[in-house]
Curated annotation (Swiss-Prot):
Region called Disordered, residue ranges: 72-107, 119-138
GO molecular function: GTP binding; phospholactate guanylyltransferase activity
Entry's Gene Ontology BP terms: F420-0 metabolic process
Organism this protein belongs to: Haloquadratum walsbyi (strain DSM 16790 / HBSQ001)
Residues making up the signal peptide according to the UniProt record: none
Pathway recorded for this protein: Cofactor biosynthesis; coenzyme F420 biosynthesis
Polar residues bias (residue ranges): 92-107
Compositionally biased intervals (Low complexity): 72-85
Keyword field: GTP-binding, Nucleotide-binding, Nucleotidyltransferase, Transferase
Quaternary structure and interacting proteins, as annotated: Homodimer.
Gene: cofC
Name of this protein: 2-phospho-L-lactate guanylyltransferase
UniProt cross-references to NCBIfam families, sorted A to Z: F420_cofC
């Protein structure tokens, strides 16, 4: 399965700002993205990162004219839209063995090293400030990096730069299903904050029959979707699960639904963090623990929450 994973590093996870700083939210979002990518790749699926252009530019250390390369001399394989206004192609960069989605006016050469920089912002000045707040202990931010490099095949990740909102950006990718020159008969979209994802859960989704297969989120959103019909388009505004289900049935498309705790739990707010510590065996839980975030039982309610212990705090 070819899986599109939308991701942005522009002010991610703002609802966690009561427990994490801005740079910490970025680092935690990257840790969750690691878990999603490594899980998908462990089952042999291909991953396409759908990210803002500026993220790619920063990762490749390219600016202005350096990012604009005449594509007429590039041998490309068309893989996305058939329309002229949002047509994309995929270039095989022989030097890096990496595939890059590009617009018809420019190509961004993304090496495996740049992929890892996208997943870990080495140049974020906030990291230094946040580190100083924690008495110089930088380990909590970088704890996942070495493991990630071992688990993620960065040279097998496709990168598509798109600055539009989530819905039009994803629909541009889905246009490939109606392009007879592309090899796609089905595409999946999986959100980058599904920290509880496992190979078993994702295979349940991909094995489910239906023109459209939905994995609803707890708040009414669509956390993952498989599209096997070229006419279907997503709309992530509001209660998108209900809207996607209705749109599919209105078009006489068969719909499969996967009721999964692991796919249904997107991590957005502090009350979601206990789920990561309880059920994630990857980098997301390691990152939280390294940041001093622990499970905490509320004696009054009997429910499990979280507490944060700073590195310089005395242990009771």
């Amino acid at each position: 399965m070819h899986v599109i994973v939308p991701y942005t590093d522009v002010s991610p996870k703002t609802r966690l700002n009561s427990i994490l700083t801005a740079s910490e939210r970025t680092a935690f979002a990257q840790a969750m993205l690691y878990d999603v990518i490594s899980t998908l790749q462990s089952n042999g699926h291909t991953v396409e990162l759908l990210i803002p252009t500026e993220t790619v530019m920063q990762a490749t250390d390219q600016r202005d004219q350096e990012t604009i390369i005449d594509s007429t001399g590039v041998s490309t394989e068309a893989v996305s839209t058939s329309t002229s206004t949002h047509a994309d192609t995929t270039e095989h960069n022989a030097a890096s063995d990496n595939y890059v989605s590009q617009s018809p006016t420019h190509t961004l050469s993304v090496t495996p090293e740049a992929i890892m920089r996208i997943l870990r912002d080495d140049d974020d000045p906030d990291n230094e400030a946040s580190t100083q707040e924690r008495d110089g202990d930088k380990e909590y931010i970088d704890i996942t990096v070495d493991t990630a490099q071992n688990q993620i095949q960065s040279n097998q990740i496709v990168v598509t730069a798109d600055d539009r909102a989530l819905t039009p950006a994803v629909n541009s990718c889905l246009n490939r299903l109606s392009d007879t020159e592309t090899p796609f008969s089905e595409l999946a979209v999986v959100m980058a904050d599904l920290a509880l994802i496992t190979p078993t859960a994702i295979e349940r989704l991909f094995a489910r029959e239906g023109d459209i297969v939905l994995a609803p989120g707890r708040g009414g959103g669509t956390n993952a979707i498989v599209v096997r019909h070229p006419a279907f388009r997503v709309d992530y505004h509001g209660t998108s699960y209900r809207d996607h289900y209705q749109a599919a049935t209105d078009a006489s498309l068969s719909v499969g639904v996967v009721d999964s705790m692991r796919l249904g739990t997107d991590i957005d707010k502090p009350t979601d963090l206990p789920e990561v510590l309880l059920h994630n065996n990857g980098m997301s839980s390691v990152w939280l623990q390294s940041a001093g975030i622990e499970l905490n039982l509320d004696d009054n309610t009997g429910r499990v929450g979280i507490t944060r212990k700073r590195k310089n705090e005395d242990v009771d």
